[in-house]
Amino acid sequence: MIETRFAIPDDLPNVIDLDSQITTIKKIDYWQDTFGRFVGKKGRYFLIAENRNGGETEIPLVGFIVGEIRAWEFGSQPCGWVLTILVKPEYQGRGIGEQLFEAICKSMKDDDVQTVRTMIAREDNLNMSFFRSQGMMAGPFIELEMSVD
């Protein structure tokens, strides 16, 4: 049985391990900073998915999702942003990402958010398919960028 809950500081090593399994880069400083800014903070969300068997944790962590509420950027009303979502490869396709996404959306809605956004690379078909399957579509903003070199 997969259960979602808010992250606690003890989850940090498992988050670092899962991220490094998927990205092949061990980003210890990045995740320490992210935990400090998101875990237990109002308007910020770090949710964990665990595989539970009879109340005991069978596998410490099978996925996580991170997001926050942002307000008034370029005239935007306060809205939720999903910043990252990861699910262990052997657990993908089992609805865990959907469960995490639904949990973060519920938490944001409980905090009076009416819109949830995310940003993905155009060629990231896996995440594009996932977020579209959750009902997300192109929004009213366009990302612009330039090199500062």
Which residues fall in each region the model found?
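Acetyl-CoA-dependent GNAT
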Residues: 2, 6-10, 17-77, 83, ...
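Conserved GNAT acetyl-CoA-binding A-motif
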Residues: 108-120
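Conserved active-site alpha-helix within GNAT-family acetyltransferase domains
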Residues: 98, 122-140
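Solvent-exposed, non-membrane alpha-helical residues enriched in polar/charged side chains
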Residues: 35-36, 105, 128
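Conserved acetyl-CoA-binding loop-helix of GNAT-fold acetyltransferases
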Residues: 87, 93-106, 133
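Short hydrophobic/aromatic beta-strand or adjacent loop that forms the aromatic wall/cage
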Residues: 43-44, 139-143
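Hydrophobic adenine-recognition pocket in adenosine-nucleotide-binding enzymes
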Residues: 7, 85-87, 120
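Alpha-helical elements of Rossmann-like donor-binding domains used by nucleotide-donor carbohydrate transfer enzymes
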Residues: 14-18, 33-34, 99, 103, ...
